[in-house]
Amino acid sequence: MAASPGPAGVGGAGAVYGSGSSGFALDSGLEIKTRSVEQTLLPLVSQITTLINHKDNTKKSDKTLQAIQRVGQAVNLAVGRFVKVGEAIANENWDLKEEINIACIEAKQAGETIAALTDITNLNHLESDGQITIFTDKTGVIKAARLLLSSVTKVLLLADRVVIKQIITSRNKVLATMERLEKVNSFQEFVQIFSQFGNEMVEFAHLSGDRQNDLKDEKKKAKMAAARAVLEKCTMMLLTASKTCLRHPNCESAHKNKEGVFDRMKVALDKVIEIVTDCKPNGETDISSISIFTGIKEFKMNIEALRENLYFQSKENLSVTLEVILERMEDFTDSAYTSHEHRERILELSTQARMELQQLISVWIQAQSKKTKSIAEELELSILKISHSLNELKKELHSTATQLAADLLKYHADHVVLKALKLTGVEGNLEALAEYACKLSEQKEQLVETCRLLRHISGTEPLEITCIHAEETFQVTGQQIISAAETLTLHPSSKIAKENLDVFCEAWESQISDMSTLLREINDVFEGRRGEKYGYLSLPKPMKNNANLKSLKPDKPDSEEQAKIAKLGLKLGLLTSDADCEIEKWEDQENEIVQYGRNMSSMAYSLYLFTRGEGPLKTSQDLIHQLEVFAAEGLKLTSSVQAFSKQLKDDDKLMLLLEINKLIPLCHQLQTVTKTSLQNKVFLKVDKCITKTRSMMALLVQLLSLCYKLLKKLQMENNGWVSVTNKDTMDSKT
């Protein structure tokens, strides 16, 4: 049986659709980085899977052949519609026209070839039992399928370049207008240009926001979110800082304040473009060192690999890796804000880890020369000991950083220093300004260092990026508050200078609030709370439009409708428990299938809470938004399962693919229902959505169970093969 195709870019860097004897693989250079492209390909991949996953030289009933022909024709028709859209895009983008047209021609030819190869009108080999024996050119179908997927992917990626071009063009317009704003000398001219700037920023915010939501890479999404947050907050700062400069053109601190805002916005704009184009200017590389928790995680994986392979790596590499991790501990031990008790405990655990690594290396050397049971047990004990020490070290570091952050946030909750700076400003008290500016600088250094420590123990790359963003924000905003306060102190009666200081102080307070949220998220990750059930919730912000505000009011169905929703929700809640039980069976909790399954269960649980009037989902619009994300996560799960199926034998693979092909249509149906407008029938829409979700969760439970069994079977077969191979090797030596 040919390897089944899976969506490009799923579970790997390249867009590889399969391998094996069929050679059903796509150009590995076609890397897919966005969810929209991936999801556009999924229905096509599913149909092609149906076409090529059949045995060669088998008897097929007339009904089966007609079904195959219908799929072939459907693929061809879908490709035809797709090509028309591609050609329209080409006509609007002359710089990409030739490339898109070539890919469209290839796609059209491949679609026609598949339709021709699955056409049964010319088959007349009817057997006596009413069955038709077909000798379809399966190699031809696979070649055409490979060409089709490759060309369709090329068109989608070229169309994606159009989106990137739009974002770059929008950024360039914003930059050009910013340059005009920097040079403006009159209020009237400033107001006109800023109005244009505001419109351009709104356009850029929409384009970059859509791109952020479309990115597959969570690290890039977090970086994009950080850059967009800077732009959003700096837009108001730019307005007040520029007005202050125009009001007080000879004030040095006002100019310094304004320049700081412009510089930060330019850096953020460049960061967005860097992310969407996936390239750094002038060949720059990411110089930020990995966090302590990430280093410990990688180190533990290396020592645990010794259970399987004693020659996997060198002793020197392990020693160097541990020393690098312990060297980074200096961020904690050298910090003036780390308590004496925490410092002593960190140093003690670091010394213990060094000693246990030396013991492990000693046993490891013995294990390489002596293959005895006692040595193997001693090696296992050494691995467990150092793993335990590292876990204790992680706990101590986490306790140190989070306790410091919590104390700091509590201490600065009333913003005494900011209030004092505002007061000294309107009083024109330069002496008091110097005193409170010094206090704010101290507070800033504390917060910056705390963010640095939190990054080490954050636990995930997106949270690491959020910590870096918080650190940079405190660093920059602290200086800007001082320059804004200095301007007000020099011009105490200036309303615009006071307004400007207020804006920067609000930005500081907002970042303090964000840091509280960040601390909660870091604790949730560390403790593995069920609080992660809300991890994928991303609610839209209410608009000022009355219609939108109306739709965001909590929906109140009648008692009968509430009872029906509650009943559906109860079944959904039970299914999330079943899914969680299946997930707990897996030894490898980092497995992609497990991660997507856990995410779906998490979101389904928040839907269940919604049916009880609890949890974070407050309105039907919140619910619909969450369901859209749930459907997308389901499609990602099917992609990972398809990738796993390629490792299985034909019968097991077919059994798994049948389950996948049940889930994919449900995901698409749920996406369709969420987009369908049902005026004054909100309950009907919610009812349909929860019913679809329940069906998907039931399939998820089956899929998780089946994948777990097939994985265990695969591991046993592989272990058996290794044992036989080793025995044959020993026999040959004898």
Curated annotation (Swiss-Prot):
Topology in the lipid bilayer: Peripheral membrane protein
Presence of the UniProt keyword Lipoprotein in the record: no
Induction: Down-regulated in cancer pancreatic cells undergoing differentiation and apoptosis.
Gene3D superfamilies: Alpha-catenin/vinculin-like
PTM annotation (Phosphoserine): residues: 374, 538
Keywords: Cell membrane, Cytoplasm, Cytoskeleton, Membrane, Phosphoprotein
One matching Pfam family: Vinculin
InterPro entries: Alpha-catenin/vinculin-like_sf, Alpha_catenin, CTNNAL1, Vinculin/catenin
Expression across tissues: Widely expressed. Expressed at lower level in neural tissues and at the highest level in the adrenal gland.
GO biological process terms on file: cell adhesion; Rho protein signal transduction
GO cellular component: cytoskeleton; cytosol; plasma membrane
GO molecular function: actin filament binding; cadherin binding
Annotated compartments: Cytoplasm, Cytoskeleton; Cell membrane
Main function: May modulate the Rho pathway signaling by providing a scaffold for the Lbc Rho guanine nucleotide exchange factor (ARHGEF1).
Annotated family: Belongs to the vinculin/alpha-catenin family.
Assembly: Interacts with ARHGEF1. Interacts with DTNA. The interaction is required for correct localization of both CTNL1 and DTNA.
Protein name: Alpha-catulin
Annotated organism of origin: Homo sapiens (Human)
Designated gene of the protein: CTNNAL1
